[in-house]
Amino acid sequence: MHELGITQNIVAIVNEYAHGAKVRRVLLEIGKLSAIMPDAIKFCFDICSQGTVLEGAVLEILEIPGLAKCRQCGAEIALEKPFGICNCGSVHLDLITGEELKIKEIEVEEVCV
């Protein structure tokens, strides 16, 4: 389960960017073709965030669909797998979206001085 290592890195990155402020929410973008299981990330997030400024934070995951462009005709096609066939018959596709793993937003509590 590589999601544990990925989640540990996500927690470390968010922790660094929070500069000690309590994190309320984290928004991730995960591509549907990335071979990363969002449910496993959510499970690991609850464990990995314990004892950090992320403890209790809400993890939101936005799944990005697979999209490719045909090299032959230029058409864009939706992909459910990391490969496919265009309506023109070509298998020469360039992936546009679907393999993302991004920390898109971090919401922290405002620090009152």
UniProtKB/Swiss-Prot annotation:
Zn(2+) binds at C70, C73, C86, C88. Gene3D superfamilies: 3.30.2320.80. Pfam families: HypA. The keyword Nucleotidyltransferase does not apply. InterPro entries: Hydgase_Ni_incorp_HypA/HybF_CS, HypA/HybF. PROSITE patterns: HYPA. Keywords: Metal-binding, Nickel, Zinc. Ni(2+) binds at H2. GO terms for molecular function: nickel cation binding; zinc ion binding. One of its GO terms (biological process) is protein maturation. Involved in the maturation of [NiFe] hydrogenases. Required for nickel insertion into the metal center of the hydrogenase. NCBIfam families: hypA. HAMAP family: HypA_HybF. Belongs to the HypA/HybF family. This is Hydrogenase maturation factor HypA. It comes from Trichormus variabilis (strain ATCC 29413 / PCC 7937). The gene is hypA.
